[in-house]
């Protein structure tokens, strides 16, 4: 199945994530403790959500984070890991260049 999409938008106050097969969510910049740009992440197993040949979306569980929210395009190796005090989110854009650009822009929004 080749359906699904992930859309990440950086607003003035938060990260908005719209992804197929899951509820949209937002992460306020003030809640973010740190972020990482990764290309070696083991996504683990799906708890609830979708896993097809195009996207992985929903709640997943892995050894590194335990239960976390995931919204990624499978064809893009880079992803941004967003840590808050209570949760971990992993997202990416539709290509590597856009994902790196989003990471760099997000860094400027969370750094005082």
What are these regions (language model features)?
Residues 19-27, 33-85:
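Non-transmembrane, membrane-adjacent beta-strand/coil modules in membrane-associated proteins
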Residues 36-38, 74-112:
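Terminal and domain-flanking low-complexity segments
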Residues 12, 29-30:
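Structural motif detector for alpha-helix initiation sites
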Residues 1-6:
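Alpha-helical transmembrane spans
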């Amino acid at each position: 199945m080749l359906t699904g999409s992930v859309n990440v938008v950086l607003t003035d106050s938060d990260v908005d994530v719209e992804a197929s097969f899951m509820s949209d969510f937002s992460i306020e910049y003030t809640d973010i403790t740190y972020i990482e740009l990764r290309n070696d992440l083991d996504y683990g197993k799906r708890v609830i959500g979708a896993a097809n040949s195009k996207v992985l979306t929903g709640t997943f569980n892995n050894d590194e984070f335990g239960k976390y929210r995931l919204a990624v395009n499978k064809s893009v190796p880079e992803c941004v890991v967003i840590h808050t005090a209570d949760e971990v989110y992993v997202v990416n854009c539709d290509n590597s260049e856009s994902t790196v650009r989003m990471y760099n822009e997000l860094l400027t929004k969370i750094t005082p």
